[in-house]
Amino acid sequence: MAARAPVHLRGFIARVALNKKNLHARHKLDTDIDKYYYTLHNVIIPDFMDMVKEIPGYPERIKKCVAHTTPSYFEGWAFSTELIYKTVADKQHQTERNLEKCRIIRALMDMSYAMAGILDDYVDKGEFRRGKKVWASVCEGGQEAAIYDSIAVTYLMSLMVKRHFGTDPGYSKLIELFNMVPGTAAIGNTLDILDRHDTNYYDDTMWKHSVQNKAANTVFPAATAGLIHAGVLCDDLLDRTSEVFGYTGHLFQVWDDFMEHYAVKEQSGKGAPDTKYNAKTWATLTAMAHFNEAQAKEFKACYGSTDPAKRSRVRELYDEVNLRGLYIDYLRNTYMVVEEKISKIPDPRIQSACRSYMDWLLVEPPQDEEEAESVLNN
């Protein structure tokens, strides 16, 4: 099947570059979000509390930690778990219990990102996540205790997977995926820190390895876990699906890099740690590839500074090389590559789920906006 060329990119991560409000719009099929939160607060958290019930006061701490931190990103991202499962699993497999288990996977994946986020906030000295103060700033014991909380919750997650999936055929594969998220996030973020000392903004070698680990390899497990829960254990199908959703991890990271400069803090839900700590990002590497000599020199003099005037000048330099347009080009090119990957998956149901997620991410406008545009065009 030939790759489709989208006429318009109006999806979730394209909106900020199109001067549209950065709506956190859900996938059109993500209609049971109330059940997601019910599972998080009435199944997972009580199970966690039960696991540590012998320790005075600790169950309540775990409850507060999870409730405050999870999800740490827009929970619509991890809909890939449910989308894959509901599209691929046979209808007779989709019992109420198996649907609940699917939501457990989704919420635990979000929790895994949240625990990695606690460590990330410590390294970046972050103050806010999703518009809320970070856990370390509100919990008893402060930063030191918060770090141990992240380790403890990650351990409880493994017990939760065993409790609910321990007898399933795909249990060992699920455990591997849940271990992958904190492990590869640690690798990627370490590379990210080390790369801050290298001011050669023309070399993207380390950045590619960092993003592969901290973004791609942490995002695709949510989708792959949904496929395993659907009963697909074929390594070839799992690998192909993982590759497709690995690209979504890259896209989320590039979107995050772009958002730091083209979204207000109220939209992004955080500050600007990349600029402050001289981090190499998609934005810096792409802009440097298009700067002339004078622009490159000025950029190096301004980037990494806390001076508001210099930070403002960085944004102006990005505008001079039309970083918005370069961002849209990157999204479009990535979409074409991923579409080709999807077309080679030898299972039409998996193809359908992958394509549906990518179209939400890049192509389809939010339903409310689509309806408004329809009225205006008629």
UniProtKB/Swiss-Prot annotation:
Superkingdom as given in the UniProt entry: Eukaryota
This protein's GO CC annotations = cytoplasm
For the ligand (Mg(2+) 1), the binding residues are: D120, D124
Q: What's the cofactor?
A: Mg(2+)
Principal EC category: transferase
* UniProt keyword list: Isoprene biosynthesis, Magnesium, Metal-binding, Transferase
Pathway terms, separated by semicolons: Pheromone biosynthesis
Q: Give one GO term, molecular function aspect.
A: metal ion binding
Q: Where is this motif: DDXXD motif?
A: 120-124
Function (record text): Sesquiterpene alcohol synthase that catalyzes the formation of the pheromone precursor (Z)-alpha-bisabolene from (2Z,6E)-farnesyl diphosphate.
Q: What is the official name of this protein in its record? A: IDS-type sesquiterpene synthase
Origin species, per record, is Nezara viridula (Southern green stink bug)
Q: Which gene underlies this protein? A: TPS
